[in-house]
Structure formats: structure tokens, C-alpha cells
From Swiss-Prot:
Protein name, entry field: Ribosomal RNA large subunit methyltransferase K/L
Gene Ontology, cellular component aspect: cytoplasm
Broad class of the protein's primary localization: cytoplasm
UniProt xrefs under CDD domains: AdoMet_MTases, THUMP_AdoMetMT
Top enzyme class: transferase
Subcellular location(s) per record: Cytoplasm
Pfam families linked: Methyltrans_SAM, RlmL_1st, THUMP, UPF0020
Stretches assigned to coiled coil: none
Amino acid sequence: MKALFASTARGLEELLKTELENLGAQECQVVQGGVHFQGDAALVYQSLMWSRLASRILLPLGECAVYSDLDLYLGVQAIDWTSIFAPDATFAVHFSGLNDTIRNSQYGAMKVKDAIVDAFTRKNLPRPSVDRELPDLRINVWLNKDTASIAIDLSGEGLHQRGYRDRTGQAPIKENLAAAIVMRSGWQPGTPLLDPMCGSGTLLIEAAMIATDRAPGLHRTHWGFNGWAQHDESLWKEVKTEAQVRARRGLSEYASRFYGSDNDARVIERARTNARRAGLADIITFAAQDVTNLTNPLPEGPTGTVISNPPYGERLESEPALIALHSLLGRIMKNQFGGWNLSLFSASPELLSCLQLRADRQFKAKNGPLDCVQKNYRLAPTQPGAAPAQIAEDYANRLRKNLKKLEKWAKQEGIECYRLYDADLPDYNVAVDRYADWVVIQEYAPPKTIEPEKARQRLFDVIAATLSVLGLAPNKLVLKTRERQKGKNQYEKLAQKGEFMEVHEFNARLLVNLTDYLDTGLFLDHRIARRMLGQMSKGKDFLNLFSYTGSASVHAGLGGARSTTTVDMSRTYLEWAERNLRLNGLSGRAHRLIQADCLSWLAESDEQFDLIFIDPPTFSNSKRMEETFDVQRDHLRLMKDLKRLLRRDGTIMFSNNKRGFKMDHEGLAALGLKAQDITQKTLSQDFARNRQIHNCWLVTHQTKD
């Protein structure tokens, strides 16, 4: 009997133990990442040929204490390597683990290699050669703290490499993990199996191999025992011949079918090629088809199992499409696959919740570094006339109500960009803005009292409901997370796409960028204020401070302003403003753009203007102020500088987003100015639910009696 070790992915150890016991293994002991077991020479070959779950089969040779590199060298050399492989065989060393002495795995591998080579040369035998790519024998050394475990890797390459798949491209799951997913899915061989997002077909091919009694090692051409001195070629041939006979018989007797589809025709062709290599092309049907068009291949029965490893995203921008995909999949399952089983493997439990299905069983496993879950669902038979379950029903109803009210209004007003929803319901703390045929969802950062998982689930529900209510394609939805802005956060880039789209606001054409920044280039709540500026600007010199992308300057120019002066500290936004002006035929000396700190420029300028628009930040750092700028604290100083630039009959439109802002009327009067609160006049229908979104004032010189 030989002591052996089978490694596997985390979470599959118990499943592997059962598999090895069924092959005849004895004294199986589960440890993290694998199973220790005992077996004779026949079992060694049986486990290599038939284990669908093991990553590698190792034959331990011994252990040694490692307190220095010399300890490692001597411990390895103590093994009788000349009885393990011949000097004309090639070998390679795989070393993993570090300690205080061996701090580099390459150095550890070199010391092991030196010890093995020296074991031959000290007996006056030829020096064996190293072949890192395809050695005759692979030595595995694992250093755990101060103990090195030395073993022969009888697998050679990982056992997940069955020989049917092209290894050039990245695959989302390895074959042994795919086999485990199939085993845990509840699918029974002899019943239909469908994968609607099959990729290169791994899940279906592994299932077909199980169903037709085809050994996973049957198509492998290279093994780690080729150079092992104790290798029994005749015994190995017996194991291989038996596997070939069983595979032929299993395929000829199998009556059911497997179905796979994917939206990428090139991937489907690769899946067909893989199935041909595996000898299973005759029982697997592949089709290039999007999940949107998925139908039950056997509507009259029999029932079977749907299995898949659907895509998941690590980037926020990919989530809307994935949420839509999972929501759609859930609806299709309920509508077309009643009575079937469904099993999905995912790194995102939140996405699986978008199915709106209750799982009967679930399993955990590691897919490389990712913590994953497999959930099995029993799909109830479809009831005629049953109403589909709604996601985030309260939110969906409110959005539907707002849409009915605002869509007609926006069309009459001649605007394409407006707010559909603004945290109307406390459980759904988002803003939803429409930009022509696009939608931007901004998630306000949830309070710390809300569990992150619950907040994330609500966001997923909002996205799914928004897509459903608006009938929106997932690629037309942009998701952002908004927090209270401090300092320069509002200028920080989120992405680098550089994609601009043109929208219409009354008679103005404006460019917005929905992805690259937290804001889009157009403050929707100032829409009425911009129209008022256009109506007030005819024949006037117009100044736009803290101009952002210059949309107010565009409206003033279109309203007939004699000149526009647009000032902002950001070169990016000034270039954007210039594009906006040119888009509307506004260019030349009459339309100046100035890059400057607005407060410093204001303090130094001696120009005169008839109409000034200023929308300063609530708080910022500024060279002009000794420390900071606070709009509540410093608005009188701001007005003092603005007064100097304002002509006798001129008007300042002053706006800010400070909640609870109080205008210092007495201080203004002392400056010879007066202010009229026009906030309510500047709030359009889409912001009627949030009357504190901004405050807006008209400031003029006091008239003398």
C-alpha cells in the first residue's frame, strides 16, 4: 500500500473523499485543500485516470525540518533519488511556501534541484537534466513554516487538463471544478442538461463525460509517472484499455442530449471543437444564441436541468447589464422551464438574488482566489395566468408614476435631460436622471447604520426595476456612487472613456459625458436659471464665474449677449465649455474663456459687466482666502468684489447648494446691494420634490430715492 495525497479546490474536499472511496481508496482523511489516502499500485493509476475532482495526485517521499538552506539541501539529498528515477530522465522542481530562511521560492527550488543532481553525481552517475516544460518526473516541495514536504507529482500537469480544451485562452472555471458543479447540481444522467451561457462548453462536456462513463484522463498524452522507476506500464495499459472500452460502451448506450448556447459565435465554435476532441460532439448541441432569445428545447418534456456559470463583474459600470441579465434569466426560467431544476455557480450572491427565486440548496467553493457559491433551484410548474413577481415594487410604482408625469412635460418644454426620481422613498436612496435615451443612476452613499450587503441588494433591485419600467437596454444605463463632495472630489475622474453625447435643452445644444466624472457636465437643477439668463442677456456683457462646462454662457450667447466671459480653474472644463459654445455657433473674441482661480480673478479684475452668473462651491480651498472659502461665511466678501464689476443697472444671479443658506440682507444693504430670492421660480417640475436642491438670488444695486 502506498500513502498518497490528492489535492483539490477549496470546498471540494468531501466530494473528492467520496470519489476516491468509490475508486477503492482506504483510510481517507480530509484536510484543507485535499485528501490523504492509501492505495495499491492499481489505485494509483485508477485515481489518475478516473478522478474528476483532484487537481493532482502526489506520492509523498518524506519530510525534513528546514531551519537553514543547508537543512533543506541535506533533507532532500537523504532521499534515495537513484531508486526513484534514472539519470537519463528529465525532472523539474515545483517549490511553494516560504519561511525565515527560504524567502524566495526560486531559491528553494534551486537548492532542491542541486541536492537531487548531487545525489546522482556522488554515486558517479550521469547528471540528470532539468526540463521545466515537459519533464519525465515532477518533484513537488511544500514548505510550511519549518517543515518541507517532498513528493512526486504523478499527475505531471494538473489533472484539470483533460486534453480536450485549447489552453491558449483564459477559462472562467477549470475542468475539475466544472465536474464538481455538475455533481452538485442535482442533475441526473439520462435527463436533458442545458447551459444557456456555455462559453467553451466545459460544464456540458464534463457532464457528458460523467453520463457516458468516459474517464477524464482518457485524452491526456503526458503523465508525471513517465520517468518514475516504479512505473508499471502493463498495469497502466490495463487501466487505460478498460477506460476506452467503458467510454465506447457508455457513448453508444446514452440516449439523452446536452444543449449549450452563447451569444458569441466564435466561442460556440470553440465549444464544438472541444466537444469533438472529447469524442462527445454527437450528443451535445451548440447554438450561437443570446439569453434574451432562450427557449426551452423540449417544451413538451421531459424536464431536465439548467446549469451555468453566468458572468459577474468586478467593475461598477458592468453591473447594470449583469443585473438585467440575471433578472431576465429568472423570468425565462419561471416562464419556460417550469418543472426543471436550475443550478448556478457565481462569485456574486447578490446577482443571483436578482433571479427572484428561492434556492433549495447551496454549496460554497473557491474558484482560484474567488469565494463562490452554487445555488440549486427547483422551478415550480408554470401556473397559467400567474402574475410575475415584481422587483422593488414600491420603487417601480413610484418611478412609473413620475415617468408618466414628467415625460409629457419634458417633451412640451423641449428638454431631453431631467430627473425622474430623487430619493423619493427612504429605502431606495438614489437619483435617477434621464439623458435622451440614456439613464444615469446615482447611488447616495448609505448611512453607516445600513449593512453594506443590504444597501448593495437594494441598489441591484433599483437597477433591475429601472430597466424593466423604462424598457431600457442595459448598455444605456450608467451607475455611479455619490457622496458628499469635499474639496476637489467633484473634479476627480471616474473613467477614461472620453465619450460625449449631444443633448438639447430648450434652444441650446450641449455636450454631456455620462461616464468619466461624477457629474455629467450639466447641472439639471439649474435648467430654469439658465433659461432666465438667456432671456435677460440680450445686448449685455455676461460674466460666468465657476462656469463648469459653460452651459450658462451658451444660453446667454443664444439669448443675444454682446459678449460672454467664462471663467473656471479647470482646463478640462474650459475646453468642454469651448466645445459647447462652438456647437452653438458662438466663438471668436466676443466669447472669452479664462482659466483662473475665480476668487483671485474676481479680486483683481477691473472689467464691467451687465449680467453676472455665479454658482460657487459650498466649500473649497482658495488662494484668495487665508484658509478656506465657505459660501455662508464669505458671501458678503464675494458680493463686495462682484459689486465692483457690476454696471449701474446690472444684475447678479447668485446660486449655491448650501442647505439652509441665509442671505445677509443687512450686510448687503451696507454694501449698497439688495437681493431677491427667486429659488422657487428656478425649480422645475422634476425638482419640485426637492425644494432644497439649490437656492437662487437676483442681486442688484440699491436705487437711491
